[in-house]
Amino acid sequence: MRRPIRPPTYNDEIRRMTHYAQFLLVMAIVLQGTTSTCAAEQQATPPDSIRAKEGFHVELLRSSQQGEGSWISMTFDPAGRIIIGLDDRGLARLQLNEQNDAATFHPLENTDSLKHVRGVLFAHDSLYVSATNSQAIYRLQDFAGDGQFESQKVIQELPYSSRYGHGTNQMTLGPDDMVYVVVGNDVVFPPSLATNSPYRNHQNDWLLPSSHDAGHDDRVGYIAKIDPEGKSWTIVAGGFRNQVDVAFNQHGEMFTWDADMEWDIGLPWYRPTRLNHVVSGGEYGWRWGTGKWPNWYPDSLPATLDTGLGSPTGLVFGSRSNWPQEYRDALFMADWQLGRILQVKLTAQGATYDAESAIFLEGGPLNVCDMEFGPDGALYFITGGRGSQSGLYRVTWTGEPLASPIATTDDDSRRLRHQLETYHQRIAANEIEFIWQNLGNEDLWIRHAARIALENQPIESWRDRALSASDSIAKRTALLALARIGETADQAAIYDHMVGFQWSKLQSQDRLLPLRTLQVSIARHGLPSEAVQQRLLADLDPLIPDNDFSTNWLLQELLVKLQSSTVLAKSIDLLEQSTTQEEQFQYAKTLSHVSVGWDLDSAKRVVNWLEKSRRYTGGKLVETHWRNLKNDFQAILSSSLQDELAGDWERLSQPLPETMESTQPIRPVVKKWTLEDLVEDASKLLPNQRTKEQGERALAAANCLTCHRIGQRGSFIGPDLTHVGKRLDGRALLESIIDPSRQVDPKYLNTNYLMSDGRLVSGRTVGVSKNQLTIEVDSTTGNTVVIDRVEIEASVPGTRSPMPDGLVDTLTREEILDLIALLRG
C-alpha cells in the first residue's frame, strides 16, 4: 500500500537537494573516462570465411565505415534501394550499383530522433519504423519525392521500460495487406487495441505463485496487426518472450522464432529458442520468472521446433527467391549469437506443420540482424548490433537453371482451422453447433481454434451445453473455456463435474486437460467450498505418483493448494526418485509451498537434497533458484526444527570448494597495450590458427574464467564467451579486451539509483517487475537487494564496464594473440 502524500517541507527540499548533489558528484566520477578508436578502414567478415550450402555464392557488398553506425534492420523500397535502421539512432539508405555487387551509404536527413531502429518496412507508399528506444511506431512519407521523408508521424506510442531490447521489433506486410508489428515482453498492449482481438483475456494463471516472482505483471510478447494509418490495432497472438520477426509462407501461415532465457538452462521452466506457428488467438505460454508455462499445457500451443541456444533475429521465406523449389518453400532464420542462417523445411501435419532445420550458411563472426530477398531474387542480409561491425551481403544461386515455381494448395485441416478462426472476432450464434463439433477434434490446433471461437461467443449461448453434455473431449475443452471467461458463480458447476470424475480410467495424458482446467478455475476465481475441496482431494490423492512427469506436475500443485495431508511425503519421494535436475527443481519448488506436517526426518531428507543439488549445473539462475529454495525451506520450518538443523543450514550457506581454475600467480606488467599495438595482427587471425593449448594457457594467465564462462567452465558474472567468435572478429575481440567499456551489453552494466531516503544503490539489474527492481550489488556472491520503483528519485546507467582495463597488460603479444585465436575458434 502506497504511503499518503504530504506537501514537501523546506527541510524535505534541502534534504532532496543535498541527496541529488551527492548523486551528481558520484555520477561525475562514474561517468568520467574516454574511449579511443582507430580510423583505419573497417572490414566486415570476408566471404571466404563464410560457409554456404553447395550451389550458393556469398558476396560482401559493403562494410560499414566509421560514422556509419551499426546496422540492425532493413527493407527494400520500390526503387530496389535498401533502407536500414541503425543501432544507435537514425536511418540510412544503401544504394546498390547496376550489377548489385556494391553499395554506397547515404544517411537519411532528420531521422536522428528515431532511436534504436529495430524494424523498418516499406509498404503503402510509406516507411514504417519501429524505433524501440523512442518508444513508438512511426509512419514516414516522402510527399516531395526527394527520398528524405519530410512527413514523420507517430502512429502509436508503446512505452518501454527496459534497456535490454525486448521492446518493439520488426514489422512485416501480411498477405491481407495489413502491417504486422512484432513486440517483445517489456511493452504493454496499446490503449487503442481492438477489444475483440483474438488474443485477449490472458492471465498468468499461476496456481502457486512464487514469492520470488512477486511484482511481475502479465506483460507478454505479442504480435499485432494494424491498418496502414495505424488506427486499428488487433492483437493476433501472444505469450512470447522476445520474438524479433515474423514471416508468412505461401499459404499465408505466419511463423516466428522466439528467444530463450539462457540463464534458465537446467531449470524446469527453461524454454529453448523455438519456432512457433502463429495462429489466430494463439497462446504460447511465456510468462515472467519461474512462471513460464511448459510446452504441454492444454491452454497453450506447443513449439513447432525447438532450436536450442541462439539469438533469433530476422526471418524470411524463400518464396520470392529465384532459387530451386526446396529453397522457395523453406523458411530462413538468422541467428545473431551463433553466426548462422538456418534453413527450415516445413511439412504439413494436420492444421499445422512439422519442421526440421539445417545450417544454410555460417561464418565467424556473422552476427546476422536482418535479411530480405531483393528484386533480383537474391538474399540480402546485414550484420551488426550492439555497436559491432556491420556488412551487407548478397547470396545468389549458381547452379542449374530453375524450373517454374510449383503451385501449392491449402490443406483440408488448415481450411477447417481458418473457418473456425473467422469466429474469433465475429459473433455467430447459429454456428455454435459447428464450433462444438470441433472442440473434440483429434487435432490440437483445430481444438484450440474452436475453443477461442467458443470463448468469443456470448456465454449464454453455450454455457448450459458445456455443463449438461455427457463427458467427452469437447465437453472438457468447453469447461476450460468456461474456467477462463466465466464468472465466479460458474465455477461451482465445473467443480461438480470434476468431483466423482472417473480419473482412474483416463490415461495420464488425458488427465492433463481436466487437471489444468481445475488449476485455471482456482487461479482465476479462488478455491471452492471446503466440502468440494475434500471431495476433490479424495479423487486426486490416489493418482500421485504417476509415471508421467507432466501429470505429477499438475497433481502435486493441486494437492498442495488443496492442503492434502499426504502431499508432503509423496513430494519428497518424487524429489528423491526423479533422475533429472529439472524434475527435481520443479518438485522442490512446489514442495516449498507446504508449510505444515514437517518433522525432523522430512526436513533432513530435503537438506540432503539441497546438499546434492547445489552442484547442479546450468545457467546463471540455477544457483540463484537453489539459494531461494534453501531459504524458502528454512523459513517454513518451525523454530525447533531450525535449531536442530542449524549446523546443516550453516554448512549449506558456505560457498562450495573452489571448482574453477585456480587464480594465477601475480605476473609483472609486460606493457600497457593499446589497440594500435595489436590490431593489425589480431585482424589477420583466423579461427584455430593457433593451438588450443596456447590459448588455454593465456586464458588462465588472464584469469578470464573468474568472471566469464566458456563451455562448462567458469563463472556467470560476465557474458558467456563460448560462441563469442561467431559475433566478433579479431579486431572487435581485441577492442573489447583492451577497452572493455567501448561497447557493453546493457545486461552487464551497473546502474546507480538514488533513493528517496538518500541511499545510493549501485549494481546490475537482474530482475524487473512492474513495481520493483532486483539489483545484484555484489557479482561475486550474487547478493541482491530489492528496491521499489516509486522510491527511485533518479537513476543513471553506468558507461564503464565492470571489467577493469589493463587485464592483459601482464600478457605478452603472443599470449594475447593466442587468447584471441582461442575465442575466435
Predicted regions, residues:
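C-type cytochrome heme c attachment motif
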Residues: 378, 697-712, 720-723, 729-739, ...
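Beta-propeller domains with acidic blade repeats across secreted/periplasmic ectodomains
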Residues: 39-423, 662-663, 667, 679, ...
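Sec-exported extracytoplasmic/periplasmic mature domains
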Residues: 142, 228, 459, 523, ...
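C-terminal substrate/ligand-recognition segments
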Residues: 372-377, 443-445, 516, 557-564, ...
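N-terminal secretory signal peptides that target proteins for export/translocation
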Residues: 1-20
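Long, ordered, helix-rich scaffold segments
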Residues: 384, 388, 397-698, 717, ...
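Bacterial N-terminal signal peptides
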Residues: 22-34
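C-terminal structured "cap/appendage" subdomains that terminate the fold
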Residues: 368, 376, 385, 582, ...
